[in-house]
Design a protein with these regions (language model features):
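Sec-dependent N-terminal signal peptides
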Residues: 4-13
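N-terminal signal peptide c-region/cleavage motif recognized by signal peptidases
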Residues: 14-18
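Extracellular beta-rich repeat passengers
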Residues: 20-75, 80-87, 91-93, 105-115, ...
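Residue-level detector of conserved, well-ordered beta-strand and adjacent loop positions
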Residues: 75, 131, 267, 466, ...
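Primarily the HKD phosphodiesterase
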Residues: 99-101
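C-terminal outer-membrane/trafficking sorting elements
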Residues: 471-479, 483-558
Length: 558
């Protein structure tokens, strides 16, 4: 039994090391370091565009208006017409410097279907640009065309009611007026690659396809996209809905920019469990969603807020978020619909660390009892830590009682006392938003130190092994954890067979056997772990098949 216990400890340590490899440790909070007065430390330099409304792009020379069923390479200036899907496990390669202009009349969009790939590798000096086909003279605006949709076979927690019954969950991506096979996403392969999306700008997308709520597309929509996909250096500007939205899967990303978009900047749903580091949000006081609730972060597990697994449990770090009030000096128009810097609801469990939020109406809202339990009672499940919410935000905390949130904030180094002047960006609030900003920190900035990467959520929170490679399993979730009497073990399996589940105490003794040779099917499986007979403390749950053994940490706290 001692050997099993030591193996459990070794597995947890290995998981931590694997997860840490993604993160770039910083001393500073926010997306940018202290300036060295050279472009080298400003990762938005060269490839971002702060004035796309007035950028004259060349006229299109070729047109794509039908699905792409064979591997294809694009270059030059392309007119994108209709919904164009890359199908049949094909690869769409887009060369650096290519400009693809979306058609307004047909509400065009580009869809990368499950099994297909996009290889869009731009460079800092030759980014790939997706933009509106409208001219500067005619005027461009949010929602001129559809956007980019990447779909994969990663695990999601929500299946559509009209889908064919599968041994896994799949769904149609939201936004389209009718469902068709090319917009299905979800499966069992969280390590899948949908290609590369690097040094890319997306401008003026997010069209509403109908008058029905949630019928808008986004800048970059990711449905069930796996961690083998490379996404970095992506700017979404003037998007008519969300800049970036993740529906399940576990794709990672670095260096994301949301600039003057309409609805939410980073929206996570349906069990997404990836990681994002280095992100910039810049809002415009005159651009918000008329339907209400324009937020920086908006995160759901599932509506209503019930315990569907896997949980939405992604981790963000090093985000700089500039709200519509900027340094607090900007008066918002009476028709504005801005809300929160962070809106966590419907049983979500995302974590945000080492980040700065300035100029919002509200700061952090933890909404609903199940969501609150994830943060206030289960720090290994979800956490907000080492944040600065500037003192110009009138309501730093909403959703729970202020005293509860103050206690939470104090324990997790969430600072609500710093002014924008103390945060001290190099040029964070230019008079005109079209002016190139500089969100690096001056040497005297209070955000120049204090970041930390020791929180357990950086290693997957121990309770989530979705980011490790396993022979039998794609995803393992144990929820709730800590357990107050009963928890559910969610297992997304790669194999058919049998599974045994044991609970082991810290001495190595088996104290509970929730499953003995239980049938295991490819896809979603559930095991109830009844902890009522266990004393408060730390345990290890082992999952054993004919191919492998995995271990998850369990905390019991009645």
């Amino acid at each position: 039994m001692k050997k099993i216990y030591l193996s459990a400890i070794a597995l947890v340590a290995s998981s931590m090391l694997s997860a840490q490899a993604f993160w770039t440790a910083t001393s500073y909070k926010g997306a940018f370091p202290v300036t060295d007065n050279t472009p080298a430390t400003n990762w938005t330099d060269s490839w971002c565009n702060w004035d796309p409304e007035n950028t004259n792009y060349p006229a299109t020379t070729t047109t794509i208006s039908a699905n792409i069923a064979t591997s294809t390479t694009l270059s030059g200036v392309v007119h994108l017409v209709n919904n164009v899907a890359v199908t049949n496990n094909s690869t769409l390669t887009i060369l650096p410097g290519t400009i693809i202009r979306g058609d307004k009349a047909t509400k065009s969009c580009l869809i990368i279907t499950r099994g297909s790939k996009i290889m869009a590798q731009g460079t800092a000096t030759a980014p790939i640009i997706f933009t509106s086909n409208e001219t500067v003279a005619n005027g461009r605006g949010p929602g001129d065309w559809g956007g980019i949709v990447i779909l994969g076979n990663g695990v999601i927690n929500t299946a559509c009611t009209s889908c064919t019954v599968q041994p896994f969950k799949e769904n149609y991506v939201e936004g389209f007026t009718t469902n068709f096979p090319e917009i299905l996403y979800g499966g069992t392969t969280n390590n899948e690659s949908s290609g590369v999306f690097s040094y890319v700008r997306i401008e003026f997308s997010g069209v509403a396809l109908s008058a029905t709520p949630n019928s808008e597309l986004n800048g970059l929509t990711m449905g069930g996209v796996g961690q083998g996909t490379k996404i970095d250096h992506v700017q979404c500007s003037f998007i008519g809905d969300d800049a970036f939205e993740w529906f399940g899967g576990n794709v990672d990303a670095k260096y994301l920019v949301s600039f003057r978009c309409l609805d939410d900047d980073f929206d996570t749903d349906f069990g997404w469990q990836g990681r994002v580091q280095f992100g910039l949000i810049v809002r415009d006081k005159d651009i918000s969603d008329a339907a209400g609730d324009s937020n920086g972060f908006e995160s759901d597990n599932f509506n209503p807020g019930i315990g569907r697994l896997p949980l939405t449990q992604g981790v963000f770090s090093n985000i700089t978020s500039i709200g519509p009030k900027r340094d607090g000096s900007v008066a918002l128009p009476p028709t504005e619909k801005f809300e929160r810097a962070i809106f966590a609801r419907r049983n979500t469990a995302i974590s945000i660390h080492n980040s700065i939020f300035v100029g919002w109406e509200k700061g952090l809202e933890i909404n609903g009892a199940t969501t609150a339990d994830n943060y206030l009672n289960s720090p290994d499940t979800a956490d907000m830590e080492n944040l600065i919410i500037s003192d110009d935000v009138p309501r730093s905390f909403t959703g729970q009682t202020y005293s509860v949130m103050q206690t939470y904030a104090s324990a997790r180094n969430i600072d609500t006392t710093k002014t924008a002047a103390q945060i001290n960006f190099v040029n964070g609030f230019p008079t005109a938003l079209e002016t190139t900003p500089d969100y690096r920190l001056n040497a005297a900035s209070t955000a120049s130190a204090g970041a930390s990467f020791t929180n357990t959520t950086f290693s997957g929170g121990f309770t989530n092994l979705a980011n490790t490679t396993k022979e039998s399993f794609t995803t393992i979730n144990l929820y709730p954890n800590p357990s107050k009497g009963s928890s559910t073990l969610y297992i997304n399996s790669k194999i058919n067979g049998a599974i045994s589940v044991n609970v082991i105490d810290i001495s190595g003794k088996v104290v509970l056997i929730p499953a003995m040779d239980q049938e295991l099917n490819i896809g979603s499986n559930y095991v109830t772990v009844d902890t009522q007979s266990l004393s408060n403390g730390i345990y290890f749950v082992t999952l054993t098949t004919g191919l492998s053994k995995e271990t998850v940490k369990l905390i019991v706290n009645h």
